[in-house]
């Protein structure tokens, strides 16, 4: 009986997640960023706020953990901190990314050094979350407001900034929503168990990628030269090497006769194909 209940909950969760993901995909607004400008490390202005792309040496100088944690208000969404929200009696399914930004910015003694690296000309973390009625709207909406400068950052503009930073660092938080209370509690319990099983040892995000690239015969940069690479250029190299290796493997398999590639799309054989289709 207990196993049946577990299987039923698993099925319920899977169905809810599938529906939520489908809805998120349907409703998600696509932001158009110039991939070539990102590759060359050009600055971007959104709503007048300058966004600077860090180089590898910037992250090294600051410290990788400090860098990524310092950007967590922008990199995280409600799913990322749902246990914390649930413990505070807040339903993560009803929280927007702009609210997550505001919540994490209010953590005492939070280090904003990484924010200064990405936003050198403006302290975006000083903005306050408010419901504001905009001139072109009949209803109020969530915005970030800078009282000193009388500057309003609309939620759509904040989402565009967040998506750009996430794309720049190649970090996209998962989105997991649920409807019923039982399913939500099940997901929270699962998160708690996963957290308990994790060790306190810090793991590097960049080290495995740097090591793989430097030791790959097709990577043209030496270790010390890698310091000068922009983070977008580096992430592009990581993905391009993966595409190159998979294309070579498919090509070798097709010529060997031991692999049926008749149903493999021809584009998969092209290592110069678009990475973000």
Predicted regions and their residues:
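A general marker of short, structured functional hotspots
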Residues: 27, 154, 160, 251, ...
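Long, intrinsically disordered, low-complexity Ser/Thr/Pro-rich regulatory/activation regions
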Residues: 254-277
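Intrinsic-disorder/low-complexity coil detector
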Residues: 34, 53, 72, 107, ...
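An amphipathic, hydrophobic-aromatic interaction surface with interspersed Lys/Arg
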Residues: 1-93, 98, 166-253
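Hydrophobic, aromatic-lined core segments that form the binding pocket/scaffold
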Residues: 99-203
């Amino acid at each position: 009986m207990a196993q049946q209940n577990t299987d039923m909950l698993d099925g319920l969760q899977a169905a809810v997640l599938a529906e939520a993901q489908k809805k998120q995909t349907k409703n998600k607004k696509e932001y158009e960023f110039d991939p070539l400008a990102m590759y060359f490390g050009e600055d971007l202005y959104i709503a007048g706020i300058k966004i600077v792309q860090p180089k590898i040496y910037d992250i090294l100088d600051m410290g990788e953990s400090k860098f990524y944690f310092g950007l967590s208000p922008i990199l995280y969404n409600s799913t990322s901190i749902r246990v914390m929200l649930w413990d505070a009696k807040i339903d993560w399914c009803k929280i927007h990314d702009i609210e997550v930004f505001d919540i994490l910015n209010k953590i005492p003694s939070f280090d904003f050094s990484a924010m200064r690296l990405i936003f050198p000309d403006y302290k975006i973390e000083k903005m306050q979350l408010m419901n504001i009625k905009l001139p072109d709207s009949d209803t109020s909406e969530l915005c970030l407001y800078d009282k000193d400068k009388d500057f309003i950052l609309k939620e759509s503009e904040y989402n565009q900034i967040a998506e750009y930073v996430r794309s720049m660092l190649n970090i996209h938080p998962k989105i997991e929503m649920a409807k019923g209370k039982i399913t939500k509690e099940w997901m929270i319990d699962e998160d708690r168990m996963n957290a308990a099983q994790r060790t306190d040892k810090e793991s590097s995000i960049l080290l495995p990628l740097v090591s793989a690239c430097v030791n790959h015969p097709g990577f043209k940069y030496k270790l010390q030269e890698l310091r000068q690479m922009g983070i977008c250029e580096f992430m592009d190299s990581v993905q391009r090497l993966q595409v190159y290796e998979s294309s070579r493997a498919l090509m070798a398999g097709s010529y060997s006769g031991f692999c049926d590639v008749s149903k493999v799309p021809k584009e998969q054989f092209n290592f110069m194909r678009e990475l973000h289709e």
